[in-house]
Amino acid sequence: MKRKIRLFALVFLCSTVSLGGLWTAKNAFAKPDSPLHIDIPVKLEKANVVFDMGHLVMSTGDMPFLLGDLNLLASDFKKSGTTGNIVAVFHGDAAYLVLNDNTYNLDRRVLNDGRYNAGGHVKSGNPYAELMGELMKQGVQIELCGATARANHWGNADLLPGVKVNTDAMLRITQLEEQGYTLIYE
């Protein structure tokens, strides 16, 4: 019995390696994409959206879900000709995404593999800086919570170019909701 299990494991391992060796979010054995009919097409002429960017949840790999969703919405606005504003308010666990390379290196102690680096700092620079710059080029306003900045002893010089600092994330999000913005909370 053990031999059959080992043989099956070996065959499975070899077939997995021959298929690329890595499992992705999509099953390696799934059929090709089928045509998709959209039953409820959405066309927005104008929309104002605020993203509450306070929690960092990573997707497969090292890309935070919130940046992927923010990029998707900005791209959808552009493709569909939607006018309006997208504001992303960073605070809490996600605030370090708006740091410049030097400050990111000094303040980040979590390595890319998820381990905590108690004895030192990272040296990679902010791996999200380019994407943040692209989002701003697409018209997304990137803001940092002033309370989070003060708690971490960050000044304006510690941030990526173009990042604006608000008084407090919760106050700012409340203000934007009162102005009619739709809240997206991640």
Predicted regions and their residues:
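Bacterial N-terminal signal peptides
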Residues: L10-G20
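Secreted/extracellular ectodomain signature
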Residues: R6-F8, L22-E186
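Positively charged n-region of N-terminal signal peptides that target proteins for export
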Residues: M1-K4
